[in-house]
């Protein structure tokens, strides 16, 4: 089974929002998220709920829960077997924040 490659989206100024988000998580939450990213690399577009969910306009969310902490990293699939991580957030409500999705869609359009 071929694995996918996971890369961080990089802005024109060189920032990598998903990487910054990942580094800001607690050690336990970061470890679980990295574990989930490895699962995403392995299963790619075959990964389904509860780990991954399609949102809209080609954007998916990787869902990680550690205790009462729930984090999400938004991503999209690119040419070949490439997964681009755009941004992340700690979930505080039942719905994914619209501004986070809008940012991910904008980032996707700048790449595709």
Question: What is each model feature region?
Answer:
Residues 89:
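Residue-level signal for short, function-critical loop segments
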Residues 86:
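ATP-dependent carboxylate-activation loops
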Residues 1-70, 79-83, 92-112:
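Basic, Lys/Arg-enriched alpha-helical interface segments
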């Amino acid at each position: 089974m071929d694995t996918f490659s996971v890369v961080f989206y990089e802005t024109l100024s060189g920032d990598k929002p998903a990487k910054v988000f990942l580094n800001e998580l607690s050690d336990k939450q970061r470890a679980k998220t990295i574990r989930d990213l490895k699962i995403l690399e392995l299963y790619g577009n075959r990964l389904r709920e509860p780990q991954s969910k399609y949102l809209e306009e080609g954007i998916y969310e990787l869902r990680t829960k550690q205790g009462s902490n729930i984090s999400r990293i938004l991503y999209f699939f690119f040419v070949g077997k490439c997964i681009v991580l755009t941004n992340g957030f700690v979930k505080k409500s039942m719905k994914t924040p619209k501004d986070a999705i809008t940012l991910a869609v904008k980032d996707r359009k700048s790449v595709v």
